């Protein structure tokens, strides 16, 4: 932790709670700031607000009163989920009150070097791989950011000898100022969060902010499989290293089935524990970041050959009577399911899919389902998916939910088959979150083992 005095006796407003807002409030309070927290959830339903009140922090809940900003705040720390067109944020900016997100605060309170990972897909897996490799190497890596561990809380506790491995969303990056990671990594850039950002250009601009304070002493890792990312290499002051599955590049790459870092052989690509081309990209990205932090090949190979996946993200659960089972509940859109399917032999694969109907069709998925052994469909999109399967002459069965889907499909499968839950849909028609959906699938798996 840095010895920060700039927050002492400063009036700071934390707008929006949840885990990151609560962490920011507690960190600022410990640093001597005069903290006010404002959250829209009523106090009696607001566990975070109740905890903060017990800590002596001023809490205003149930609404966002504009006149609160008349109190002459020196800074606003905004929950990343709150949009910039929120009246409170607009008023703060009109009053020239700096508005930051909690990751900027994390940078300010820690001397530990930061590896920042952003992108559209693969962030959580890549972030976890990097941390696991560094820890296997005997270093001290701390997971933080958009991965469930509030960045400011982790940063405040970190030592200068630690490495903060930080997953960063576009929402978080919009609220940085001086934030400067030692290593930044962009996994890929696809269409996402247009409801928040308004356009693809604005979304990508938010992601690109990860490198805006970097210099030639810092490293930016880019995915050269994607032309969009390749073109960014000339637009940064940072030193660029690339990863690619298609060509030899400055960082990690695949050549004739072998993985290299620069000219150094690391391992056979076939040894990776996670299936799919996208996970090969994730592994290459993690190798570059880990090598830049001095990790030995032994640690890299140890992790990449044994990593079971992040929970709900193409997570290998095990076998039931010779059938392999994977939980990819995080696949809440067609693109994510396409990436999951790329790692399997369709002729032995049973796909479990369905969920919230957002009004879209599934035509883009058809080519990825060729020769699929069978499907089980559920949720609001069950009929759409069933019709598509019938059109492609794929055996298809309907079920009530993910748990019944697994139980009911088992008699149809054979030894050597693979069962994959990759819904291609959001979970909100039947479940509160994709995590709840995945947990119920795991429970069903455990009951059948």
UniProtKB/Swiss-Prot annotation:
GO process terms (BP): cell division; cell wall organization; peptidoglycan biosynthetic process; regulation of cell shape
Subcellular localization(s) per the UniProt record: Cytoplasm
Pathway(s): Cell wall biogenesis; peptidoglycan biosynthesis
Superkingdom of origin organism: Bacteria
Ligand binding (ATP): 119-125
Keywords: ATP-binding, Cell cycle, Cell division, Cell shape, Cell wall biogenesis/degradation, Cytoplasm, Ligase, Nucleotide-binding, Peptidoglycan synthesis
EC number(s) on file: 6.3.2.9
Disulfide bonds: none
Keyword check for Ligase: yes
Gene Ontology CC, one term: cytoplasm
HAMAP family for this protein: MurD
Function: Cell wall formation. Catalyzes the addition of glutamate to the nucleotide precursor UDP-N-acetylmuramoyl-L-alanine (UMA).
UniProt xrefs under NCBIfam families: murD
UniProt protein name: UDP-N-acetylmuramoylalanine--D-glutamate ligase
Gene name in the database record: murD
